[in-house]
Every structure is written in C-alpha cells, then in structure tokens.
Amino acid sequence: MPITISSVLAKETLTEAEIKNGTALRLARCVRSAEGEFSEGPHSYYWDVLRFQAEEHPSPSKLTCLAFRGEGRLPTGIRKVSPTKLATHEVKIDSASWRVDEYSLLLSTNEHRMLVKCGKDSLIIGGGLQGAAIREYGEIISNASVDENYPAWLQKRREALSSKPAPSEGPLMSIVTPAYKTPPAFLKKMIDSILSQSYGNWELVIVNASPDDENMRRVFNEYADSRIKVIETPENLGITGNTNLGLAHCTGDYVSFYDHDDTVEPYALAEYVRRINDSDVKPGLLYCDEDNIDENDVPSLPLLKPDYNEDFLLSNDYILHWLTVRRDLLKMVELSGKDVEGAQDYDMTFKITELSQPVIHIPEVLYHWRIHSGSTAGDPAQKAYTQNAGTRAIKNHLARLGVEGDVVRGRAFFTYVTSFEAPSPLPAIDVFCDGDPNSATQETLNAYNAAAIADSAVGKRLALWITPGHRLKLNDLLTMVQHATRNGVFSVSPRVIRADGLFDYANSIVAPDGTVRKLLTLLPSQDGGYVGRSERPMDAVVGNPECCLVRMDVAADLGIEHGISDNKSMLDAFVTAWCAGKRNLYMPYATAHLSTPRTLLEDENRQRVDFDILSGLTGRAFDDPSSNPAFNPFDPYYKLAK
C-alpha cells in the first residue's frame, strides 16, 4: 500500500485531544539509508516523522530527537539526532486546514529506541513499533525474485495455460540441444518435457558429444519416438560447434535452442505456435519468460522480461533461453563461432535482430533453467569465459552495424557497459529550466558549451530539461549526449540520486490508469533492485521530465517541437515519440544529484499521460512494453501481480 499522509491517518487517526490542541506527531515510515557497503546489510534507517499543526495554531515548536543505544531496559548510550526538514504539506482534517511538516531522522541499526518531541507532543519509537516499521519497509521493497509465493503464482498460470487447446496446425518446430556429460536424470527430464508438449509437430535434435557415456546412451535407448534424432560426434566440438552440427540436421520452419539439463512447460511450443499463426508477418525471433529450478524441480527466481528492448539487450542477454529463430534466417547469417563460445545465443540474437524481422515476446514462464553443481545458473564464476564471449558478441554486433562503440564487463555477472562515441564537433545544447540551473550544473554547461558548436541549428539539436535542484557533472552530460545522438533516440534520462543517497529516478512506467510511476524510488543508490534493473539502460515509453536531454530535431520532425512547455506536455511528447518508433532511454551510466531534500511520502496527485495519444497512436489497450504483464503495474519494485 502506498504510504501517504492519508494512509498514515487511516492507520492512526488524530485523537480528539490532538484535534483540540491543534498538534500531533506521527511516524510515517522508515527506509534503509545508503550508508555502508550494501552487501553488508543495513547500517542505518531514515525514520520519517510528520508534525501536524492546525492552521490557527501558533508557530510550531522545534522538533527534537534522542536515540538510545542498546536493546536492554537501560540504554548503553544516548545521542541527540538532528532532524532534516524534508517538506511541508497541506491537508484537510474534518474540513479544517492543517499544515504537515515532514522530517527525517537517521538512526543506526544499534539504536533501538528514540524519543521525538515537539512542543507538548511526544512520540516514542522502539521495540514493536520499530520492528513493525522495518518489516513493513521490507514488504514494500520486496520483488518477484524473492517472492516465496512464486511457486503458487506459477501454478495458477500453469492451470490457465494448460486449459487452452493447442493449435491443430502450424509450422514444424525444431529443437536443437547440444549434450555433453549430461547427468542421466536431467537428460531424461529434458527429453520428457519435449515429449509432453501439447503441440505435436516438432523434432528434437540432440547432439551427443559424449558417445562413450554409457549412462547417456541408456537414456537415449529408452526412446523410440521418430521425432527424436540423436546425432553423435566423436569429439566434443564445444557448445557452438555442437549446436551448429545440430542445426545442420534441423528441418523445421523454426529452431529453438534448448540446454541439455533444463525443462520447458508442456504448452511451451503451443504458445509459440499460437503467436506465429496469429502474426500477419511471420516473426523472425521469439522468446519467453523463465525461472530457475533446483535438482528437485522446485521453481524460483523468475526472470520476467520486457518486450524487445534494444538498449537493455546491449547490457545483458535478457532474451536468454528458449530463443527461437525462423530457420530460413539462419541461412542468411554466419553461425556463431568459437570466439563467442558460451554466449552463442546472445550472438545469434544480435544477428537475427539486425535483419529487422519481427521479434515476439511471450510474457509467460515457459522455460526452467536448472541450478545444480557445475551449472552456470548455480555458479556463474565456473564459466567466466562466457562473460568475455558476451563482450565480443556485442562488439561484433556494433561492428556489423558500422557503429563506433566500446564494451566492458559490468559489475554483475553476465552484464556489460556499452558506450558510444560522442559526435564531433559536439552539438550545442539549449537549456530549459524553471529558474536558473544551480551553480554546479551551470559550470558543467559552460564547460560543455566551450567545446560545442555555436550554431544549434546545425546537425542534431539537443535541449536539456532540468530543475534548479538537479546537479549534473560534465562526464554525465557527455554520456547523455553520446546516447542522445544515436539513431532512433528521442530522449535520455539519467538516474537521479537524492540528497540522502536514495534513488529519486531509476526509470518509470505508465500504469493502466495513465499515471506515471517512478521505479525503485527510495532504494539506496547501491541497490540494483529486481535483477539489477536500476543499473541497466532501458528503452521506455516515458522519460523523466525533470531531468532529460531531448533531440529537438526529432521533436520538430514529429511536429511537437513548440508544444513542450511543462512536465505534462513533456510526458505527452515522450509518448508521441515512442509511438512513432523513437526511444526514450533510461541511462544509469549518467547520474544527476538532487541538492535539496525531498519527501519520503508517495505522491497522491501523480501526473498522467494523455490516453487519447496512446489509444490513438497504438490502437490498443495500453500495457507498458518496458515492463511485463506479470508485474503489478502500480508497484514500483517489480512485484508479481496477484
């Protein structure tokens, strides 16, 4: 539930005495601070305290706080805490106007009680109240990857999808699986999951690179289905070589890439074929959502993917397993070689998308990636070479496109940071700010403009929308320029970190009611959020109207150059550009910092995009493609929809 002044009062209304006295104190929430190494766990929390004061009440008293160290009845230390004023709000209580001053108090995790006083009002926070607030915070920020109810959620989806009849007609689906020293139990489960497919027009091509493994041979001998082809190779050719050998024996219209110890849902092929049959233009590539399973087939860690997202793909192979490609397209590209061993699916994804064929995402968990000793899923460090192969896959992709860029490995396993050359000379930047940019941002702009061309009408035209509270350094602005001047980009929004070290902006989505929802707000800036989403570039429907770099030449082409005057019109410009096939890029490699405090409460008056624009340009009910239908669209932390 969103934490607002209304929700705080709903939980604990003002008493008659408080209304009569015209003052009150309430604890709104707590959030983890950004202090310390994130991996070490919380070092401290911000406690959000509200001071209510009736309009006719005299000037407020000073708010004070004492924090008590130690868990016993007698404290081992006392510390005076300096409150930080965050915001002032105006509310109506019983038709009367009240002012609400919001303060944050920073307490370490070994301070288990605090006393807050303001005038005659006092608030004691400790024991049960403190623990309850911390638990509530944990529930608020939890995401799908740690949801203990995920197996039950998956079972409901299984029941819904199993009830759908499989297509009676459709393409021949080839499935290619390189197998090397596969544990027999997992090999059998892999084959059985294909035999259980509700869609029957398939062939399974297994390349056995362990022909002397008697346990594997015994498993193969159990099956007499003519749709299963076992191709034996006397030597292990590696993942790419074995896969390519299997491709040579595939005869289907589409080819799915399948690992030797994983499983798929019995309706996996049916869902793919359904989408293929329903498409006016046959898709070139299809992919689905997935999760992990342990050695006992217990599911966990759902990987719920967005629709095709060019910039997200440059940071990680999010398409990953059960990649399915139209076979005639495989004849148009060079098959993956040893240089991308372990990242061959990533390499193939790039090659197929370069052909500009339709890409279809099926937002259902159809694939299960097995975690066991020796698997990449269980320990990514066991196959570190695959991460270097991923770097080469991206570099080769950029080279084929004729794009100058550089790729380095990211902070997390199997993630990458792709950068591009800024244009030379640099384009000039017009600045739009409600007031004057702060001194740090102005210094950045002065340094940039000293190197930029004088005439902004030449080449790509850029405009920076920014508030006086946002500080932007030169390297961050240059990163934004690098990406804003790429083909197809309309806007670039950096991640924004608050004065207290928490996220203010780490991408946003449009909810079904048209409201714009900032994602991962108030998490510590070191927190990657759901599978590292705060750290990955993402093409989005909307950007951040408070801080973004916009291509004004693109705006002019779209006829919206002169219609951008405030945050609302900027949001509508984002949507118009996205509907026209342009990209609004969330760019976490650039960071803006807020210089002034902001509220820890949620906005009760969210801005909305113009649904007439969305429905008019998309012709369909809106579902944000940078998210996933499995997520709760009103939750900023990637929770499962119930």
Task: Indicate where each model-derived feature is located.
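Acidic donor-binding segment of Leloir-type glycosyltransferases
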Residues: 195-235, 435-438, 442-453
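Conserved donor NDP-sugar-binding/catalytic core segment of glycosyltransferases
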Residues: 267-300, 470-515
